[in-house]
């Protein structure tokens, strides 16, 4: 292959990659997580909700509902692994590829998986309506194959006095979880 042919080949490859990047910026990506009740020491079996994720540009919108939670605020996070075993403990820690401190969704210093709290009303299902520009359905912050975990208690957003505040938001036990899968 001559030098000119090599340069032409490299130019075609670079041009193709560049066009693909532009197309992806306008693409709508979709994912879904079926949420299961946590089973201490075992694997979940009872479905308690569905959460859909839709990404347009850099914004991911999460929309769904979960049943069976106690009224009040519950920590809502994306964890590093898509393993729902042992009462959702097998999902590992919060998704935190940059080794940041725990924080609120609007904080610049936060885990990628820190999505704050969801609120369960006194009666009825828990609505999930979250928008976030840090998580993604592609690339470095891709959450596909990772677990959504709902905690028993309120996430203090890293502002509490407990030692757990800076790592987990002191959000308590894992009560429900589900793996995010591409649609």
Swiss-Prot record:
Subcellular location: Secreted, Extracellular space
Domain of life: Eukaryota
Alphabetized CDD domains for the sequence: Cu-Zn_Superoxide_Dismutase
Catalytic activity: 2 superoxide + 2 H(+) = H2O2 + O2
Annotated Cu cation binding sites: 77, 79, 94, 151
EC numbers: 1.15.1.1
Family to which this protein belongs: Belongs to the Cu-Zn superoxide dismutase family.
Protein name as it appears in the record: Extracellular superoxide dismutase [Cu-Zn]
Organism: Haemonchus contortus
Gene: SOD
